[in-house]
């Protein structure tokens, strides 16, 4: 596409700011930033000229990888607040003509996610298709590929000759 012919989109003139909730603003003094802390700082962010707030994962997670290992995409992690808090954040941002952009991790999930637990119980069943399962080669992983976090991208499923793929931590199986 020719940049000269590109249609201007609403976000082209907007200023975005990423918030990592865990370290942003802690309102309940537990040492962890929370959704209420983001709400509390909306006026400040608006005064800075921020139009779009990009929020790093705040879904339920065991926090092996700072929340990027999501165990439930439908729940807010209690460390950050509640779904009601999140609904309030959306309403308060809208009042200020601000947008909320959520960081959605779809490459992988947590090994604690219900789908992965079901896949482990039946590596040839329906949920196994949600992940990458491969047989090993002569007692070794299916390939010599390396994880971004070090070591093999393959983790053996205990008691089997099957491995699952994880480009990041072994606790973050890749989704198919």
Where are these regions (language model features)?
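Acidic/aromatic-lined carbohydrate-recognition and catalytic surfaces
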Residues: 4-176
């Amino acid at each position: 596409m020719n940049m000269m012919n590109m249609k201007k989109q609403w976000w082209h003139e907007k200023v975005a700011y990423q918030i990592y909730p865990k370290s942003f603003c802690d309102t309940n003094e537990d040492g962890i930033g929370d959704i209420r802390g983001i709400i509390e700082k909306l006026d400040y962010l608006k005064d800075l000229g921020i139009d779009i707030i990009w929020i790093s994962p705040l879904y339920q997670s065991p926090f092996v990888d700072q929340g990027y290992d999501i165990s439930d995409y439908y729940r807010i992690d209690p460390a950050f607040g509640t779904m009601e808090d999140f609904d309030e954040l959306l309403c308060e941002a809208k009042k200020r003509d601000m947008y909320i952009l959520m960081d959605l991790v779809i490459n992988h999930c947590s090994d604690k996610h219900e789908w992965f637990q079901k896949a482990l119980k039946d590596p040839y069943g329906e949920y196994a298709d949600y992940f990458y399962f491969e047989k090993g080669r002569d007692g070794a992983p299916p390939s010599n590929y390396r994880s971004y976090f070090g070591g093999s991208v393959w983790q053996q499923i205990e008691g089997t000759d099957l491995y699952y793929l994880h480009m990041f931590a072994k606790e973050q199986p890749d989704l198919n």
